[in-house]
């Protein structure tokens, strides 16, 4: 299954959480990438503890035969002047380009509640009006063109608590943006968490999917988040997310759809939970074994 153009990566968020720095504050950058390599992963996304000096970061990764797959970028197209987002995006793009990454993960954070510790994730979500949708789509097309200038692709990350979370919102985004400039990051965990049919979304947009986050969920924890009106970050602390093979999502059909459509790019494990409860190395190995078992990668 899969051709040689599919690579496996893992996100540092299991070791150190950028949104809640107390989670994994004891884990160093070096420990993080060493354990990723030890678990059998090739790529990583960029975390807060990663050096931003290209030379320093490259050397640390090359010693472990690793590379940067991408890094998250927060856009504020619906709440701030476009120029502010563009300036930050160009800087981000150039750093990732220097690191050899091919995709740029973008999420609209205007009106987002994902980082609010007390706002219930299932109740407090903002919904864009038509004018805001237009602004978002136009801005993303411009950023996508800037990515293309460097031979890179903008991959949009639908995410819990943001203005693009549901199937309906993904449909709208895909419809309003240029398919040659704005691509999709498929995240299994965020779709299932939201109550969407992740497989159907993948089937519909598989040809625009250029980056994949493999995230599993624990359904009973998500139900708890819903019932107790918890925030996204409270849900993370509760253990709503975990690695593929440890939760309730069946990844076999997901792998099959990607393989059948000749997916190329990264399959990147991203599962934020408390490292004091879920040992990052242990869970990285667990994820790696599961992927090997299901895909032979």
From Swiss-Prot:
Its EC number is 4.2.1.44. It catalyses: scyllo-inosose = 3D-3,5/4-trihydroxycyclohexane-1,2-dione + H2O. Its cofactor is glutathione; Co(2+); Mn(2+). It comes from the Bacteria. Pathway: Polyol metabolism; myo-inositol degradation into acetyl-CoA; acetyl-CoA from myo-inositol: step 2/7. One of its GO terms (biological process) is inositol catabolic process. PANTHER family: HYDROXYPYRUVATE ISOMERASE, INOSOSE DEHYDRATASE. This is Inosose dehydratase. It comes from Clostridium perfringens (strain ATCC 13124 / DSM 756 / JCM 1290 / NCIMB 6125 / NCTC 8237 / Type A).
């Amino acid at each position: 299954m899969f051709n040689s153009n599919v690579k496996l990566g893992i996100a540092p968020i299991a070791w150190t959480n950028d949104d809640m720095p107390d989670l994994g504050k004891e884990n160093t950058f070096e420990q993080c990438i060493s354990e990723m390599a030890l678990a059998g992963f090739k790529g990583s996304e960029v975390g807060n503890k990663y050096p931003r000096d290209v030379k320093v970061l490259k050397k640390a990764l090359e010693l472990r035969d690793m590379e940067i797959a991408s890094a998250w970028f927060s856009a504020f197209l619906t709440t701030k002047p476009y120029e502010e987002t563009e300036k930050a995006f160009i800087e981000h793009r150039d750093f990732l380009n220097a690191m050899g990454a091919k995709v740029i993960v973008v999420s609209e954070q205007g009106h987002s509640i994902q980082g609010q510790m007390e706002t219930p994730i299932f109740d407090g979500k903002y919904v864009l009006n038509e004018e805001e949708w237009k602004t978002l789509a136009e801005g993303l097309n411009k950023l996508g063109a800037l990515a293309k200038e460097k031979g890179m692709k903008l991959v949009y990350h639908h995410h819990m608590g943001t203005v693009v979370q549901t199937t309906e919102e993904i449909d709208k985004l895909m419809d309003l943006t240029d398919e040659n400039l704005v691509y999709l990051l498929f995240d299994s965990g965020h779709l299932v968490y939201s109550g969407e049919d992740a497989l159907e979304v993948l089937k519909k947009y598989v040809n625009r999917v250029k980056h994949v986050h493999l995230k599993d969920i624990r359904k009973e924890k998500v139900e708890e988040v819903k019932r107790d009106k918890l925030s996204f970050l409270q849900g993370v602390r509760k253990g709503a997310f975990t690695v593929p093979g440890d939760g309730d999502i069946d990844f076999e059909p997901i792998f099959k759809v990607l393989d059948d459509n000749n997916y190329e790019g990264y399959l990147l494990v991203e599962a934020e939970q408390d490292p004091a409860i879920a040992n990052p190395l242990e869970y990285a190995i667990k994820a790696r074994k599961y992927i090997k078992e299901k895909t032979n990668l």
